[in-house]
Amino acid sequence: MVKVAVMLAQGFEEIEALTVVDVLRRANITCDMVGFEEQVTGSHAIQVRADRVFEGDLSDYDMIVLPGGMPGSAHLRDNQALIQELQNFEQEGKKLAAICAAPIALNQAGLLKNKQYTCYDGVQEQILDGHYVKETVVVDGHLTTSRGPSTALAFAYELVEQLGGDAEGLRTGMLYRDVFCKNQ
């Protein structure tokens, strides 16, 4: 069974984290909210109780998801144990995903070299490696990135698809195409 860790640091962006958790769980994909602390407060003062506390080892997961928000993304970037786990995932060919400002953690881990990525407008100025593309969701190998709060659903559906879930069924059931794809 596929397992996903959504990392929660103080000041995470609630829409980005909880949308991913909700959509993955609707797809029956095991998804844990892994906090740097048991109780984590988002950037808009919403408190979330983590499913587990990060103790430096995520090897039992198949994907790590990094939500954005500030100062949450900076906390992700500055946590050396997490940076090591991101590097381990890269070496093992496991999936990594980041949205909004969180690609700064991927950059800190040295994982954006020769990769295409996207992020929240302006954050690319902090990322010296990689090739910024202004798209809703960018997939480059086993690395997936997205832009911000309004792209969280598209990001989550892409992750479901990558993990073998029924993304199209979820889009239909959640009325995504009716609302966001009327003219397509």
Describe the residue ranges of each PLM region.
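Short, acidic/turn-prone active-site loops that include or flank metal/cofactor-
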Residues: 121-125
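Short aromatic-centered micro-motifs
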Residues: 137
